Amino acid sequence: MAEFISSIQAMGVAYLGETLWTLVWTILKIAVLIAPILFCVTYLTLAERRLIGFMQVRLGPNRVGVFGILQPLADAVKLFVKETMLPAKAHRTMFILAPILTFSTALVSWAVVPFSPELVLADVNVGVLFILAMSSLGAYGVLLSGWASNTRYSLLGGLRSAAQMISYEVSMGFTLVPVIMLSGSLNLGDIVESQKGLWYALPLLPGFFIYFISVVAETNRAPFDLPEAEAELVSGFCTEYSAMTYGMFFLGEYANIIMVSVLGSLMFLGGWLPPIEALSFIPGIVWLILKTGVLIFFFLWLRATFPRYRYDQLMRLGWKVFLPISLAWIFIVGLAMHLLDMA
């Protein structure tokens, strides 16, 4: 594969010149990265509906195509052909900009995700920090949508979502600190390679548990979907959106679900490393997909199983339970590392 890519690059430089080929090659890499992500996001919606249907003893989508396999395409066509309605009192520029900001920040994070030692768009030394920064920017799009809609339900949903994302991002970030301490790097590839022989999910199990619950809350998924609580806020910050402006929020949410699942796999479950050395003949990207799929399954299972939290319970859990525990966990891991070094 490396030789094939090198030959393509050599041909491109020969025909287009180094400057133009660099631009074309960058665009090609971005397209090759984004296309599978959008495909996975689209069919994750079908997987969710089928899985929840199974858990609720019903069929789920089964009319469009064989076993409903074309349902996501039908939904995409429906969103594309619908008219984008702008509320009369909305701030129009910000109203359109908000879903674009949310969707773009959800995709930009993928630039630093390594799918294998060689398969990464941008191998930066601060990959973890970059992903956390991009996830923080997503809160601005949601808050902006609530404000720009200029309606009560949307504003309340935007404020709820921003507060929730900021609250749980703190504990999520703190749970990643022990992983960085053990690996000695912010580079995702180095963190995966440091887990040879022992995945960090085993010695850092409490942190892994808090990480998973925190990312469920940060992505506004059930049972923490307070910003979109239908019984209270109609549809929260998405109330006034339709067509592809609504679709961008929808795609951004599911792209974030896959993103935090991949990040959890890389940080705690060994990424592309096999569980035992005897299975190393299986390509690393297969292991990464399997581990990510397991985490995504738990996202969907939680939605079908648990009732929604009250907002005060949600905030109390984040600030009074997870934040102190994650801080104490950093201290415990640091103390254990110090004592082991002394021994």
UniProtKB/Swiss-Prot annotation:
MF-aspect GO terms: NADH dehydrogenase activity; oxidoreductase activity, acting on NAD(P)H, quinone or similar compound as acceptor; quinone binding
Keyword Transport recorded: no
InterPro entries associated with the record: NADH_UbQ_OxRdtase_su1/FPO, NADH_UbQ_OxRdtase_su1_CS
Transmembrane stretches, start-end: 21-41, 95-115, 124-144, 172-192, 197-217, 257-277, 281-301, 317-337
Subcellular location as annotated: Cell inner membrane
Disulfide-bond pairs as recorded: none
NCBIfam families, per database record: PRK06076.1-2 (NF004741)
Family: Belongs to the complex I subunit 1 family.
Complex and partners: NDH-1 is composed of 14 different subunits. Subunits NuoA, H, J, K, L, M, N constitute the membrane sector of the complex.
UniProt name for this protein: NADH-quinone oxidoreductase subunit H
Gene: nuoH
